[in-house]
């Protein structure tokens, strides 16, 4: 009895191992496994028929035996056809599986690239958030400084108003003092003139 080529066993084993690590395309892998079993069964049946046909040809040569040989040949031909079809189907499924695995690798690469992009964007977001926070704190500090300056200006304005009022009050008091002094000086001058009038009259 002949066995399947080693590359088929190794290929199927590698597919099953990959399926354990990453369970994708399970239907394709199962179909390949079933075809592998079918091919093995067909080859075993073909070998058994060949062996039985060879022994029958050695033991009998009558027409009945020849008819049996013809029937066995037809069965062998059918088995060969089935085997060829099974192998063709297996190759097509293996091709589909290869394409699916290639697509999976492409998607994995894209997923890894997307994850890298997301990490980069997250880093940028954290950096921008930190900058915005720092700028807000800076603006709050400047706003507080502006408020302090405004409060100081208000206080200085109030002090200036008080000083202006005091200045006006002092100016008014000075004006009153000057006015009273001038009035007093005028009264004293008039009194002196009145006192000196008799003296001027006697001299005349």
From Swiss-Prot:
<keyword id="KW-0175">Coiled coil</keyword>
<protein>
    <recommendedName>
        <fullName>Autophagy protein 16</fullName>
    </recommendedName>
</protein>
<keyword id="KW-0072">Autophagy</keyword>
<feature type="coiled-coil region">
    <location>
        <begin position="24"/>
        <end position="183"/>
    </location>
</feature>
<comment type="function">
    <text>Stabilizes the ATG5-ATG12 conjugate which is necessary for autophagy. The ATG5-ATG12/ATG16 complex is required for efficient promotion of ATG8-conjugation to phosphatidylethanolamine and ATG8 localization to the pre-autophagosomal structure (PAS). Also recruits ATG3 to the PAS. Involved in endoplasmic reticulum-specific autophagic process and is essential for the survival of cells subjected to severe ER stress.</text>
</comment>
<keyword id="KW-0813">Transport</keyword>
<keyword id="KW-0472">Membrane</keyword>
<feature type="compositionally biased region" description="Low complexity">
    <location>
        <begin position="51"/>
        <end position="69"/>
    </location>
</feature>
<dbReference type="InterPro" id="IPR013923">
    <property type="entry name" value="Autophagy-rel_prot_16_dom"/>
</dbReference>
<feature type="region of interest" description="Disordered">
    <location>
        <begin position="50"/>
        <end position="69"/>
    </location>
</feature>
<dbReference type="GO" id="GO:0034045">
    <property type="term" value="C:phagophore assembly site membrane"/>
</dbReference>
<comment type="similarity">
    <text>Belongs to the ATG16 family.</text>
</comment>
<comment type="subunit">
    <text>Homodimer. Part of the ATG5-ATG12/ATG16 complex. Several units of each may be present in this complex.</text>
</comment>
<dbReference type="GO" id="GO:0015031">
    <property type="term" value="P:protein transport"/>
</dbReference>
<keyword id="KW-0653">Protein transport</keyword>
<dbReference type="GO" id="GO:0006914">
    <property type="term" value="P:autophagy"/>
</dbReference>
<dbReference type="Pfam" id="PF08614">
    <property type="entry name" value="ATG16"/>
</dbReference>
